[in-house]
Amino acid sequence: QIVVGNGGKQLIFNALLASIDPEDEVIIPTPYWVSYPQIVNFAGGKSILANCTESNDFKISPKLLEKLINKKTLWLILNSPGNPTGSVYSKRELHDLASVLRNHTNVNIICDDIYSKIIYGNKKFFTLAEVAPDLIDRILIINGLSKAYAMTGWRIGYAAGNLSLIKAMIKLQGQSTT
């Protein structure tokens, strides 16, 4: 249920390319890492930008998430700590988002945790999988070594998730990078 790749970007690319059908939607909280919408578009999906404001520390609220989910929603991308804001979802915030996601079994979650070891102040990192283990079959965790260990040129990332998705990602990676 794990695949290693050439950085988190390749793994997000592989996951979306392996799973998105035309017209599938991906919810992306703003501000966002520049590549998310481009990867979604390349995979044939539609990016749904969730306008997250400074008043909520640039994090998606359960209310906004509920408003944006529909039958076409395939993925939610959660980046915590966030790039470019550094915003970190608390355990309570993740719990509240999980409460919404439990009602929408069509929605999978990419937890881009690449900055999990780079946190400032007294904030603590949690990933959705530890807060809501009942959603584990719908969660894809993305992480890597480059950011946490100052190895930016090494491009070593890993993804952990549902076995069928991981197998599809491995198949795609085997045809594109070996």
Which functions belong to the PLM regions below?
Residues 18-40:
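Conserved PLP-anchoring active-site segment centered on the Schiff-base-forming lysine
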Residues 30, 49-53:
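Short beta->alpha connector loops at strand-helix junctions that form conserved
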